[in-house]
Amino acid sequence: MRKIERQMNAAITNAKDWCSGNTQVCWDGAAQVAEVFLHGNLIAKIGSCWIQIFDGGWQSNTTKSRLNAILSEHGLPGECVFQKNFNWFVSQEGGAVPFFSGMRLN
């Protein structure tokens, strides 16, 4: 995991606003939700017992890396985003499902 991704996860865990380079975490205290942005595009919302993931309009390696860092720290064991034949999928306990922007993981 990259240093920026460790810092991003620390901000999410500690419910803090944080920004470095192209990545930003905004903490919404009223909703108790962390929102993660990459290049100003929303890529994740993290609640107390759920994660909602987005591609931000760009299915890039950087987006996938940030999402996987979030899932490794805040998701369930084995959850990850991967690419096969140019299509994104989410690996979960029950197997792989096609990725769609806005999908919610519990």
Name each model feature, range by range:
Residues M1-N106:
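Terminal leader/tail segments of proteins
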